A protein has these predicted regions:
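Basic nucleic-acid-binding interfaces
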Residues: 1-36, 46-88
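Positively charged interface segments
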Residues: 41-45
Length: 88
C-alpha cells in the first residue's frame, strides 16, 4: 500500500512540495519512472494502468498543480483497484 500519510498531507496542503516528494508518493503507489536521461521532467506510469501517467518537473519547489494532479491520479488508481477487487 502507498504512503497514505503523504497523500493525506498533500490533499490538505497543495503547496510546498518538490520533485522528491512526488517521486516518493508515486513510487509508493507502484508507479514506475520511465524518464529518458537528461530529460527536463520525470515521467511516471503505473504498470497495471498505463493510462495513469504523470509528468513532474525537476524542481525543488513545484506549483500547486503538480500536487493536485498527483492526488487526482492516485485517487483514480485507488478507485480502479477497489473496483477490481484488489487492496488499495
Amino acid at each position: 500500500m502507498g504512503d497514505l500519510d503523504l497523500l493525506e498531507r498533500m490533499r490538505r496542503t497543495r503547496s510546498g512540495w518538490g520533485e522528491d516528494d512526488m517521486d516518493r508518493l508515486y513510487r509508493s503507489f507502484g508507479f514506475r519512472e520511465i524518464t529518458r536521461s537528461r530529460a527536463p521532467h520525470r515521467v511516471y506510469v503505473h504498470p497495471d494502468y498505463p493510462d495513469l501517467r504523470a509528468t513532474v518537473a525537476r524542481k525543488n519547489s513545484l506549483p500547486k498543480g503538480y500536487a493536485t494532479t498527483a492526488v487526482r491520479l492516485i485517487d483514480k488508481l485507488l478507485e480502479r483497484q477497489k473496483a477490481k477487487g484488489g487492496t488499495p
